[in-house]
Amino acid sequence: MEQYLQLCEHVLQNGSPKSDRTGTGTISVFGYQMRFDLEKGFPIVTTKKLHMRSIIHELLWFLKGDTNIRYLQENGVRIWNEWADENGDLGPVYGKQWRSWEGANGKTVDQITEVVEQIKTNPNSRRLIVNAWNVAEIEEMALAPCHCLFQFYVNDGKLSCQLYQRSADIFLGVPFNISSYALLTMMMAQVCGLKPGEFIHTFGDAHLYNNHIEQTKLQLTRKPKQLPTMHINPEVTDLFAFTYDDFELKHYDPYPHIKAEVSV
């Protein structure tokens, strides 16, 4: 995936040293965009192996509106363990905001259900937006939303999605985010009777942690391989009816995994 490697190169060459919340330190740029044509293969990094199982289960977990890691742990996914409390709770993170945003008037809004309905009935709307950045509840979240707002766009029978990510851990987080939102776009397109268009990934603070620099340089020595394809069970027409077994990533032949520590 050349787009991702170009991002890595850009930050290594142009990034500025910055301190950060975790105390690890980063090199960072502000403002960057990548585009992926979903008809040209499923966008997943091939220059290191990713755990697609974790990506799928995390996305299904978001869509359930769940904010406890029990479901993830039961399915062998550990990516949220460091932030959960002793009961496995994370506070009102992504799933809560996507499915049951609480407004100041006390009304609860299911943003995902509403945006699906709007895509079907009013596809030219410029309000096809889901927002996870609920200012009133940020302090209650174990981790403030990094990928915080996404918007859909319908044109020529195709559904595209643009994500705004305020904070992007380029080595560990971004590869997951690319594949997760690409998959969400494909799922949304299917249930809305559309074809997948583009996934556009826009960043605010895009950074490499100081303890990921050598791993990133190693990855840049590897030549990207052909993108795999994602098969989605065509019989599923309800976004919330998808299960793990409805997805099959075909012809994924990545280089070996590269270990790196997560900054908490």
Curated annotation (Swiss-Prot):
What pathway, per the record? Pyrimidine metabolism; dTTP biosynthesis
Task: Kindly give the PROSITE patterns that the UniProt entry links to this protein.
Answer: THYMIDYLATE_SYNTHASE
Q: Name one GO molecular function term.
A: thymidylate synthase activity
**What are the GO BP annotations of this UniProt entry?**
dTMP biosynthetic process; dTTP biosynthetic process; methylation
GO cellular component labels: cytosol
Cellular localisation: Cytoplasm
Q: Indicate the residues that form the catalytic site.
A: 146 (nucleophile)
Per UniProt, (6R)-5,10-methylene-5,6,7,8-tetrahydrofolate binds at: 51, 169, 263
- InterPro entries referenced in this protein's UniProt entry, alphabetically: Thymidate_synth/dCMP_Mease, Thymidate_synth/dCMP_Mease_dom, Thymidate_synth/dCMP_Mease_sf, Thymidylate_synthase, Thymidylate_synthase_AS
Is Secreted among the key words of this record? no
Quaternary organization: Homodimer.
Protein name (record): Thymidylate synthase
Q: Which organism is it from?
A: Shouchella clausii (strain KSM-K16) (Alkalihalobacillus clausii)
Q: What are the leading ranks of the lineage?
A: Bacteria, Bacillati, Bacillota, Bacilli, Bacillales
**Which gene is this protein's source?**
thyA
